[in-house]
């Protein structure tokens, strides 16, 4: 059933999808491809160490295999038919048989599990001849992508032969499934091993690389001499172009400003003249003058005691005045007529035909009419004042309401059930269990105290192991 476990395949697909999703982002940021590979390897190692699933690498499409790179000092030691890795806890890994060993090349194939192996300190490599090799520091044999030496350790620190010091290096190339080869390398490769698992370039290499990078960025002396004047010329040209409006066209700008001022002053005077002319010849002014003439004629007819038949004829005479105002001499004619009417009125008031009673009556009526017109004008003026007062009152009311709203919101902003003493420390207790199911459900059926759950597309952690399922049915009593 282990080969049918879909958890490793699911986890690997998730890891690969995430790595492929961020590959372009890493490339845009200028991060090396090796960093992405190390991230993937670290992720897989974390999943393996969590022990949530077994056979994480065993069920992969290409099983990772391991290569043991042995120094020449171990050639004579491994001249035996079999050798095995013996763990102090008692677990013995499958043994391998050495077929042919020579001075330049050695190969040994043996069956080995297809997933990374963590070898703690104290593990010994034992051969049939009786030679023992003890591991001084913990190592892990993992998968590599083509080149050897992903996890390398200092010389004379990884493996130590009891009685004779020796070194062994581990790496992982892609080889045939379910086989492992042990090959020998020259001692010069052993000397390049660093004291940390990660492979880092040496100091001189970094300095050389930095010098190369610097030489790529800097410009040669000749080119620099050539580029700088061009940059200065471009800068001067651009600055000259920018300074043209200030140097060349400054008189024109000032002249334009003076012209604008003259045009503005001329337009202002023209507007004033037009405004005055419009006031003098506007229909409103003519209507006001027309009303004044009508009032004068009415008063004159009343003072002389004219009948109602003669009044329309006297009213018709000034009614033609607005029509005649369309002529160029309308203002002159209007002023002459008003002056004549005023003179005639004064002469007629002082005439012998008038009596004191008529004069008093005329003055009384004139005062009444003026008072009536004044009341009308006053009423017209009072209406906007009342409207303005009401508008100002509404504005003040809205302003006061706006000012009061934040206070109300501040009072109402108290969170609901703020007085409840709910501690978040109680929440983890709900999930303090080894068995957790995260899934979706189709339906839940209950009969009295018996429940039946129809679940789908979930992950279940049971006893520290992860299981995935497409559909599941569970029963419970509660």
Curated annotation (Swiss-Prot):
Keywords: DNA-binding, Nucleus, Transcription, Transcription regulation. It is found in: Nucleus. GO terms for cellular component: cytoplasm; male germ cell nucleus; transcription factor TFIIA complex. GO terms for molecular function: DNA binding; transcription coactivator activity. The keyword Flavoprotein does not apply. Gene3D superfamilies: 1.10.287.100, Transcription factor IIA (TFIIA), beta-barrel domain. Residues 390-401 have a biased composition (Polar residues). CDD domains: TFIIA_alpha_beta_like (cd07976). Transmembrane segments: none annotated. Residues 411-427 have a biased composition (Acidic residues). Residues 309-427 are annotated as: Disordered. Induction: Down-regulated in Sertoli cell-only syndrome (SCOS) patients. Belongs to the TFIIA subunit 1 family. This is TFIIA-alpha and beta-like factor. It comes from Homo sapiens. The lineage of its organism: Eukaryota, Metazoa, Chordata, Craniata, Vertebrata.
């Amino acid at each position: 059933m282990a080969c049918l476990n879909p958890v490793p395949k699911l986890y690997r697909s998730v890891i690969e999808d995430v790595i492929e999703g961020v590959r372009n982002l890493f490339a845009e940021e200028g991060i090396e491809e090796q960093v992405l590979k190390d991230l993937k390897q670290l992720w897989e190692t974390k999943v393996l160490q969590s022990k949530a699933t077994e056979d994480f690498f065993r069920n992969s499409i290409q099983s990772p295999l391991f290569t043991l790179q042995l120094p020449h000092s171990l050639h004579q030691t491994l001249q035996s038919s079999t050798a095995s890795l013996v763990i102090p806890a008692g677990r013995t890994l499958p043994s391998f048989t050495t077929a042919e060993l020579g001075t330049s090349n050695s190969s040994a194939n043996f069956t080995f599990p297809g997933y990374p192996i963590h070898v703690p300190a104290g593990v010994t490599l034992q051969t049939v001849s009786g030679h023992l090799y003890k591991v001084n520091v913990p190592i892990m044999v993992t998968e590599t992508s083509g080149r050897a030496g992903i996890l390398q350790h200092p010389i004379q620190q990884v493996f130590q032969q009891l009685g004779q010091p020796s070194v062994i290096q581990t790496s992982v190339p892609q080889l045939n499934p379910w086989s492992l080869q042990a090959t020998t390398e020259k001692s010069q490769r052993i000397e390049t091993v660093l004291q940390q698992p990660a492979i880092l370039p040496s100091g001189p290499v970094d300095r050389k690389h930095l010098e190369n990078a610097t030489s790529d960025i800097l410009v040669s002396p000749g080119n620099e001499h050539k580029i700088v004047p061009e940059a200065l010329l471009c800068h001067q040209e651009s600055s000259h172009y920018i300074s043209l409006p200030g140097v060349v066209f400054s008189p024109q700008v000032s002249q334009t400003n003076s012209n604008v001022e003259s045009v503005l002053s001329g337009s202002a005077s023209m507007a004033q003249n037009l405004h005055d002319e419009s006031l003098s010849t506007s229909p409103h002014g003519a209507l006001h003058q027309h009303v004044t003439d009508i009032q004068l004629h009415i008063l004159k007819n009343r003072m002389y005691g004219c009948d109602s038949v003669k009044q329309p004829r006297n009213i018709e005479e000034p009614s033609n005045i607005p029509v005649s105002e369309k002529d160029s001499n309308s203002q002159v004619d209007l002023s002459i007529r008003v002056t004549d009417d005023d003179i005639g009125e004064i002469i007629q008031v002082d005439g012998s035909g008038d009596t004191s009673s008529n004069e008093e009556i005329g003055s009384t009526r004139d005062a009444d009419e003026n008072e009536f017109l004044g009341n009308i004008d006053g009423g017209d003026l009072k209406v906007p004042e009342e409207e303005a007062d009401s508008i100002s009152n509404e504005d003040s009311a809205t302003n006061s309401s706006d000012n009061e709203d934040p206070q109300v919101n501040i009072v109402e902003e108290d969170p609901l059930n703020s007085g409840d003493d709910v501690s978040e420390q109680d929440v983890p207790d709900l999930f303090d269990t080894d068995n957790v199911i995260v899934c979706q459900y189709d339906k839940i059926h209950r009969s009295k105290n018996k429940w039946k759950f129809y679940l789908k597309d979930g992950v279940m952690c049971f006893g520290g192991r992860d299981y995935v399922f497409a559909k599941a049915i569970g029963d419970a009593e509660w």
